[in-house]
């Protein structure tokens, strides 16, 4: 049996509901290694476990895959109520489509390059020592969480193109940033990053958030009455 670790981004929308990409929770749909293996071996890929690491939370959290959209690259996961951190921020979702337009400022948040980027933020000797002691993704990310080194990358850009099914933007991100929120000028989430082109920084794609809201509501989610103010303020400050 072959096992491969995969890293992506997701975000909390309230009551333990987490949004991400379908290809993050079903990585074999987009991964060449898994596709090659299943085509040559009589086997079926499956998700062994799905763990989340949030900033300011020292423990990993088990996610349960709930459902995915059939057409768009969006998936909903849930956190068991007993595992839900008391002060886990809720990211507010934009319901007004008029706020999305070509030229508007956007901010993306995520974990491009996964733990490799987190290690790169540390002194070289310290990072090398950590990597030698914690070989697997599980143990490495657990250590980084316990030492408060799990922090997303935030970058600013603009919407460069737009149609009914995708938002094209030029804020820099990378592999591992898939599933991350794309914020509009109001600080609300307007999309979910699903495709990243490293050779062309002006062509990262996001699924418009209304597709995700529909999927969330089908899964039983209800919109919070008052979104977390600190999440909005953080993004607004970065967009200035």
Task: Label every model-predicted segment.
Residues 11-12, 154, 159, 172-193:
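Catalytic nucleophile loop of clan PA
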């Amino acid at each position: 049996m072959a096992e491969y670790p995969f890293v992506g981004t997701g975000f909390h929308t309230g009551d333990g509901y987490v949004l991400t990409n379908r290809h993050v929770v079903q990585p074999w749909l987009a991964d060449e290694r898994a596709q090659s293996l299943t085509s040559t071996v009589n086997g079926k890929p499956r998700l062994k476990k799905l763990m989340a690491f949030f900033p300011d939370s020292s423990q990993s959290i088990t996610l349960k895959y709930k459902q995915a959209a059939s057409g768009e690259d969006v998936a909903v996961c849930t956190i068991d109520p007993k595992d839900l951190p008391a002060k886990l921020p809720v990211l507010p979702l934009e319901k007004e489509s008029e706020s999305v337009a070509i030229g508007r400022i956007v901010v993306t948040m995520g974990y491009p390059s996964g733990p490799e980027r987190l290690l790169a933020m540390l002194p070289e000797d310290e990072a090398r020592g950590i990597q030698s002691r914690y070989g697997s993704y599980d143990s490495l990310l657990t250590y980084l969480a316990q030492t408060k080194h799990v922090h997303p990358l935030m970058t600013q850009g603009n919407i460069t193109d737009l149609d009914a099914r995708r938002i094209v933007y030029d804020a820099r991100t990378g592999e591992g940033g898939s599933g991350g929120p794309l914020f509009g000028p109001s600080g609300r989430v307007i999309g979910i990053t699903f495709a990243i082109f490293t050779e062309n920084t002006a062509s990262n794609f996001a699924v418009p958030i209304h597709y995700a809201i529909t999927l969330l509501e089908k899964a039983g989610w209800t919109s919070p009455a008052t979104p977390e103010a600190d999440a909005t303020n953080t993004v607004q400050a970065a967009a200035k």
